[in-house]
Amino acid sequence: RCLPESLDPKTEQNIKWSAKLGSDTHSTPVIAGGRVYIGTNNRVPRDPRQAGDRGVLMCFAEETGEFLWQLVVPKITTSRFWDWPNMGICSPVTVEGERVYVVSNRGEVMCLDPAGLRNGNQGPFVDEARHQTPAGEEPIPVGERDADILWLFDMIGQLGVRQHDSAYASILVDGPFLYVNTSNGLDDKHKTIEAPDAPSLIVLERATGRLVATDGERIGPRIFHCTWSSPARAEFGGQPTIVFAGGDGVVYGFEPLKAVPPAGEVVRLRKLWQFDCDPEAPKENVQSYVGNREVSPSNIKGVPVIHGGRVH
């Protein structure tokens, strides 16, 4: 679309605007509704009150590069293997209408207002000041350049997920539902799965953040490293399918939810099929093979891509 043949960041040749991020940026920029969203770290704080390591999601104006607002999330302090130093927020956002969905560095599925707090605190979540401040410190008051959290779902606190290194998920929107991989993975020593019963794939009600379904496959004990592969939606022979690659090297096909379950009910996703991408690999005590360069299980970290009726 009329892209230049070349560009030079040093001389700013063919560069419309640039914006300073942190020192490490693992997220993918997403452009929607005239805004640019990208996760980074806090090595170069935009808010002098927010000193130190944090996860950050920044929002800029697409046309001018003006900084609009940021989500600042304190680090998990349990150990570095929960929330690796200076990783920032690694997950890309998903934008649907006037809602922005993202998974924070603390394993929280968040719904944000794309306008930030410039148009007021919309709620129902209204404790942004406490949320953006490390535990034990006086809450940092919020302003117009801070994020407006509408709701959040804490996968660690509410599901017992043990994320590894960092949370990563590209949230899939399907009708009234959000499909999210949980980043459940290994312990600090890369030897065991601390949360074997925690789900690998969950479904939330998009409007409220309520948990409505889980994969129910108990993938946990078979996870070789972590659950970083995000779900995708496809249709095979007229059958809608949620395609999900587990941390056990198996690709699963689930039937999408058709209706929101009654209040308080969490259902199990119906599995349509599964395919083991490495059937000859070890299947028992898989974590004992970590570091083995000759024989080991496999896991999948990329998002499934569907084309021509095939999953890649």
Label every PLM stretch briefly.
Residues 1-312:
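Noncatalytic, solvent-exposed loop/strand surfaces
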